[in-house]
Amino acid sequence: MKDLVDTTEMYLRTIYELEEEGVTPLRARIAERLEQSGPTVSQTVARMERDGLVVVASDRSLQMTPTGRTLATAVMRKHRLAERLLTDIIGLDINKVHDEACRWEHVMSDEVERRLVKVLKDVSRSPFGNPIPGLDELGVGNSDAAVPGTRVIDAATSMPRKVRIVQINEIFQVETDQFTQLLDADIRVGSEVEIVDRDGHITLSHNGKDVELIDDLAHTIRIEEL
């Protein structure tokens, strides 16, 4: 039963992530993200639809019901609170934080959540600049405001300029090679980097190191002008 619950939560969180990125949540996108077969995803989505968690719209996009969104919000809140705990208190290496938080999100109790918001200094955003949603349910106030700034893919031009990193989406954190390149260049949320689009290839430069972003990930980092 626990595996079934974890799978449901994982699917809902993936839909939530896609929405955050401005990507239409389709079964094909879930199959790509979770590395599952098309038939497996279709069966799981059908079960979630029967359970009243999602609706398959006429354009085949997946829309969360109010019940589904409440559950997705809770899972993402636990995930990002865990990321803050792992980073701010435990001091886990930043490249391990996301994967560890993925395990914690399924087992963290409501009581632990309420303690965390009292212990942690900053519960507005994750260490990667992502808003921690649904804090009003913990009596902290709502943090669902949109992240400031612009997606790299929408901001880069052929003229190099300095910008500040304000958000690194969840999907970027699981792309190990690209994320490692970013960390090796000491690029974090808050870093001031040079951004340029060279013939359709977007590059971030920091401390003398260049990171050429994979095309499929250029929408997953947000920046703001200096």
UniProtKB/Swiss-Prot annotation:
Stated consequence of mutating residue 191 to T: In strain: 1030(-)
Subcellular location: Cytoplasm
Keyword tags: Cytoplasm, DNA-binding, Iron, Repressor, Transcription, Transcription regulation
Signal sequence residues: none
Predominant cellular place of this UniProt entry's protein: cytoplasm
One example of a Gene Ontology biological process annotation: negative regulation of DNA-templated transcription
TM ranges: none
SUPFAM superfamilies given in the database record: C-terminal domain of transcriptional repressors, Iron-dependent repressor protein, dimerization domain, Winged helix' DNA-binding domain
InterPro entries: DtxR/IdeR_SH3 (IPR040767), DtxR_MntR_Metal-Reg (IPR050536), Fe-transptr_FeoA-like (IPR007167), Fe_dep_repressor (IPR001367), Fe_dep_repressor_sf (IPR036421), FeoA_core_dom (IPR038157), HTH_DTXR (IPR022687), Iron_dep_repressor (IPR022689)
PROSITE patterns, A to Z: HTH_DTXR
UniProt domain HTH dtxR-type: residue ranges: 4-65
Gene Ontology cellular component list: cytoplasm
Annotated phenotype, changing residue 214 to Y: In strain: 1030(-)
Gene3D superfamilies per the UniProt record, alphabetical: 2.30.30.90, Iron dependent repressor, metal binding and dimerisation domain, Winged helix-like DNA-binding domain superfamily/Winged helix DNA-binding domain
Keyword hit for Magnesium: no
A GO MF term: DNA-binding transcription factor activity
Miscellaneous comment text of the record: The N-terminal region may be involved in iron binding and may associate with the tox operator. Binding of dtxR to tox operator requires a divalent metal ion such as cobalt, ferric, manganese, and nickel ions whereas zinc ions show weak activation.
Quaternary state and interactors: Homodimer.
Membership in a protein family: Belongs to the DtxR/MntR family.
Role this protein plays: Iron-binding repressor of the dipheteria toxin gene expression. May serve as a global regulator of gene expression. Represses ripA under iron excess.
Protein name per Swiss-Prot or TrEMBL: Diphtheria toxin repressor
